[in-house]
Structure formats: structure tokens, C-alpha cells
Amino acid sequence: MRFLAVATMVVALMVPWSVRADGVESLKAFFKSTSAMRAHFRQVVTDAQGNKVQEVEGHMQLQRPGKFRWDYNKPYVQQIVGDGEKVWLYDPDLNQLTVRPMSKAIGSSPASLLAGAQDAERNFTLTTVIRSDGLAWAQAVPKAEDSGFDKVLLGFKGDELQKMELHDSFGHVTSIQFSQLQRNPAIANSSFQFVVPAGADVVGE
């Protein structure tokens, strides 16, 4: 076992720097080449023991800087919309809407990595993670202490985002798989404008 651990470490150290840098370089290339994105997503949440506690599907759209929309469709409906100034989280079943200023909602959140400005290193410490799945992985650790999560991992094929993983302090892992991805589509501004439903219970600023 000790020999295997040492051998693994030696192999890791022998990987060329250009290969080990792929994750962060792919993240930076994504920022440069992708100003808008539309995709279907499948999201699975596991607990600290690896048990699946949630699985949902939906569609997402983003347009930098600061505009995004996540529509959860299965097994329940929920909407998260960022219009560049505020973030709106709506639960139709409860008819409840939570509103937060964009600066407080995504400064050091996973959303800021995708829809925020290109200077991710201002809010995150970026490193490359090596995995055997054929993707280039970048790890982003928030510099703010109150971000609500420990790290985000983003898996790329070239400069195209394929997967995301969110790890929180309780050991929960949220894995997001993207498919039917469109890069730089024309997205109407109305997609990021949230209209408050009649009678909704509004919470927040």
C-alpha cells in the first residue's frame, strides 16, 4: 500500500506542467470564448456518505456579465433568475419569492464563476485537478469565508463546460452534468427579467 501511494505521487509529479495546467487554462479559455450559454442540466446531490438525496433536471441560460436563469423542471418546478442587479429565487408550489442584491448573491458563489466577470481569481483561488475521466478540471476555492461552500470543480472538454461539482462544508456534493449545450446563442433580455407573480410572498431586499 505504501509503495502504491509513493508510486502514485511519483507519477503525478511526472505529469508535464502543461498538462496539469489544462484545467485552469480551460476555465480561462471558457471565459474568453463564451459570453452566453444555453444548456440542459441534470443535477444530483449526495450526502457525506455518498447517498443520493436529490436528483433534478432543467434548463439554464447565462449571459455575461451577471445575467443567468436556471429553470428546474423535474421533479419539481423552481426558478432562479439573475438580471444583473438582483437574484430572484421563485418556488411556485409555495408561491414564495426570495430576492437578493446581485453583489451579495454571487460575489463568491458558483454562479459568479459562470455569469460573473472574467477575473475569477479576484474571488477564487484557482488550481488544476487531475482526474482520469478525460476532462480538464479546474478547482475554485472561494476567498470569502461566508460563501456557503468549500469549493467548486469545473470539468472542461477543450473550452466547453461539461460538468460542475459543488462541495459544501457538510460533505454534500452537488454534481451538475450539462448537455445540449449551445455557446453564444442569441438570448433575449426578457429571459433574465423576472415578473413577480400575483400574490407571491416576497422575502428579501
Curated annotation (Swiss-Prot):
Residues 1-21 form the signal peptide. The keyword Chaperone applies. It comes from the Bacteria. GO terms for cellular component: periplasmic space. Keywords: Chaperone, Periplasm, Protein transport, Signal, Transport. GO terms for biological process: lipoprotein localization to outer membrane; lipoprotein transport. CDD domains: LolA. It is found in: Periplasm. Belongs to the LolA family. Participates in the translocation of lipoproteins from the inner membrane to the outer membrane. Only forms a complex with a lipoprotein if the residue after the N-terminal Cys is not an aspartate (The Asp acts as a targeting signal to indicate that the lipoprotein should stay in the inner membrane). Monomer. This is Outer-membrane lipoprotein carrier protein. It comes from Methylobacillus flagellatus (strain ATCC 51484 / DSM 6875 / VKM B-1610 / KT).
